[in-house]
A protein has these predicted regions:
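Single-stranded nucleic acid-binding surfaces, predominantly the OB-fold ssDNA-binding core
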Residues: 1-99
Length: 99
């Protein structure tokens, strides 16, 4: 399964959740609501989940092996870093223009 598109849908500036992403596989399947989290001095992804009746969470969809999880995480985090940098550059240029 090949990752064919990653969209960073929303970036947050406060709190441990830094962004929400959607990932498309083979131009045929999209997984929404992958969360990008920063905690314990590192970034990682959290797959979409649903709250159970006992107040625990269960992933709706998730990688079933470590290799694919690492590939997915690297790709999503790189897309986040690129989007966050672009957003930062936009803010800086907007500030410069307002001066």
């Amino acid at each position: 399964m090949k990752i064919t598109d990653i969209k960073i849908r929303k970036i947050f500036t406060e709190g441990p959740m830094k962004a929400i992403a959607s990932v498309t596989f083979d131009h045929q399947l999209v997984v929404h609501d992958i969360k990008i989290i920063y905690a314990k001095e590192k970034y990682f992804i959290v797959m979409p989940s649903r709250k159970n009746e006992d107040d625990t969470y269960r992933d709706i969809v998730h990688p079933i092996n470590t290799s694919f999880r690492q590939t997915l995480e690297r790709a999503v985090l790189q897309a986040y870093y690129d989007a966050a940098e672009a957003q930062s550059e936009l803010r800086e240029s907007a500030t410069f223009i307002q001066m």
